[in-house]
Structure formats: C-alpha cells, structure tokens
Amino acid sequence: MPHSVSEFIRFYNSPFSYWCNKTNKLVDEKKIDAKYKIQINASKLISKQLLTKAQEHEVVLKDKYRISENLNVVDMSNKDSSNKVFLKELEKNPDVIFQPYISSKDFVGRLDFVKIVDDNLHIIDAKLSSSIKTEHIMQLFVYREILETVTKKQVTECFLFLGDLQMHKVEFDEYKEIYAELKNQFMDFNNSYDPETPPYPKKGEELQEYDDEAKKIWIKDNGLELLYRIQAKQIEKLKNNDIKTVEELKNTNLEKIDGMGETTFIKYKKLAQLLNDSTENKISYEIKDASLNGLLKPKKGDLYIDFEGYPFLTIGRNFEYLYGIWSNDKNDSFTYYWSDDEEEEKNSFVSFIEKLLEHLELYPDAKFYHYFSYEISSLRRSAQNFGVYEKELEQLIEKKCFIDLFTIVNSSLLIGASSYSLKTVEKLAGINRNEDLQS
C-alpha cells in the first residue's frame, strides 16, 4: 500500500513523530491493540485558521492562472480522483490541473498544480512559507516521482509559490542523494516497524503533537534532552564521552570534552546537578548575578504586557488576537484588546500603542515589562504591516521603555528545569497559577 506524501515529510522532520502517528493510525484502523494508543498534545495540531489561509493561498494562484493569465484550469480538488481520472483529464490537454490525487507503487498524494507545457510537465506547490525549505524540496521530489511514473512524461521544472506571491524555481541536483537516502530510510523504517519499539526522539526534531510523549521518554531515561537549551550536536558530543544521562553528566569527573567549550561544559554540568535536585514542587536554582542584571525596583506606573497570537496567518508575522496590559496598582487593573479578524487586529494594535503613549504622559518614567523578545518583534512587524506608529514605537524602544524579563532571568539565574518559561520561573517566586500559561 502506498504511503502518503505528508507522512513521508513527517518522517523527514521526525521519525519519532511519524512512528507515533503511524501507531495511532493502526490503532484507529483496529490493526493493532488499543493499548498502543498515544495521547496527543492538541495545542500543537495545525489550527483551522492556518489551514484556511493555506487554502486561500492556493486559490490565489489558481485565480491567477484562470483569470489573469486566461489559462484553461481543470479543478480536481472536489473530484473522486484516481490515476485513471487524472490521465483522462490530461488527454484533453488543459493548461493546468489543480489538485489531482494520484499514486505510484510507493507514494500517494494530492499535488497542488500540474502545468502542461508542450509535451512536458511542471509541478507548482503553494506554500505559505517566506523561504524555500529542504522539506519542500523533498516533497517536490516525491511529487515528481509519482507524476512521472503515472504519466510516463518528464517533469522538466518545479516551482514553489511562496508567501511573497512569487514563483521560485527549485533546483534538484544537489538534493538527489539526500532524497534517495531519505526514501531508503523511510522504506526500511516501515518494513521494520514495531509498535513496541519507538525510535528515540531527538532534540530539535519537529515532534508536533507528540512532544509530550517524547518528554515522557526523556524523563523515564533521564535523558540529556531535558537540559535547558541543549542542542542535538552537543548531546552527541557528550554521548561520545560516555555521558548518556543527566545523572552521568552530574557525576562525571571530566572538566572538559573535545568539541565543546570548557565554559559550556561546566554550565551543563551545573544544570544537570540542579535538574537532578529539582522536584515537581520545588525547582533548584543558582544565582549568577545577585543584582539580577540591574533589574529596577518596581514603581508606580509600571505596566506588564503580554500578547497571544496565531502563527503564519499573515506572512512574516502572527495574527495577534489579544493584547493585554496589567497594572500593579491598588486595583490590579487589567486591560485587553481582543480581535476576531485582521481589521479588528489593526484597531487593537492602534489602541494598545495609544494606551502606552497616554500612560507615559502620566508616568514619564514607567517601564513596560514583558517576557521573551516576542512582544517587541510582534509590535515592529505590526507597525510596519499596518503602516502606523512605526516612528513612535522605535522611540519607545530606543528610550528603553520595554524591559525583557527573560533576558534578566537568563543572564542572572541557572535553573534546574528543562524550560525557562514564565510558568517555570513563577514557581521560584512562589507563584502557582491555575491558568495554563504558554510562555
């Protein structure tokens, strides 16, 4: 039975995620016992908003072909497609075929666009991404293989229609060996699949909705992946020196290893000790800088800001559906601006900036605290996108009105936790919230 192209790309991004997804699919199909069912992290599933935007992006190109270029476009997106139906449409010699669903011995998938040029074929894949990624090229390799197998025609060119609404030609030559090796690994992996033996999840893989399952394995194995911000290549260097767990790193007598700076190695040893000593209710930490990097004392007029958004709804920035402002005054006042669409988002952004500017008239020395650099990056992208308050925002940044508390925490503390999220750091201050904070 052929494999879906989307699952092949999932395997490229993470063999562990692919194994989990395959296992759940087999359980749902009642081909293996229900005891193998794996819980997913629903918050990591692709949002409906993103799927809608992706579909709209495809329609933009379809309308460009159909209306702007006056091409004959056959739409197979809503048809019961098969190789036979597709070949029948191809015989009619249209200019473009939209979303045919075709299969070869190894793979099955729905291509975005097949363009007929003389006796040759072009493949165009629509992506919301702002740049070409290797996974896009791997996907085009599979599409080309399927299409050439089914039609016996040559695919001479492949393109990506990216978020900038431009065509980007893809060159395959330097990726041929990568694709061949990846396909072999994929086929071998499926031939030896065992629901009892998952591949080990590696740091840096796109674990998607199976990230919690990966964390369970890391915790069970006391894996080095639990160390804060450690990279896969650093884990390999430690394993090459017979250091395979957090406890082994904590107890090693080594003071340095090849390929890793001495300062970095010592930092990870200290983090391993703190992590090993931490419990669910009490997190161990060490103060590196007692001044907390010059953190100012809180004063009247200081504000605390936080945003929530959907990724990739608009190219280059998030759709910010919530701007929040909390004031540490006697009323603990909280102001928020909610948006259901991009027009409302602009109004919310304008209201948010105007609120800050008005606040500074009352409290000229006020600081606006946030956690991580996300808020500043988001504000800059929104100001540029909406064409409002760009100058005023830059002035606020230059005057250092915004204070990133994460920078202070990261430079001042070593924490025995896998994450320096706000939810984690709050525990150090004895704060326990009921809300499930994401940052």
What would you call each of these model-derived segments?
Residues 22-23, 74, 198-203, 283-288, ...:
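Short coil/turn segments at secondary-structure boundaries
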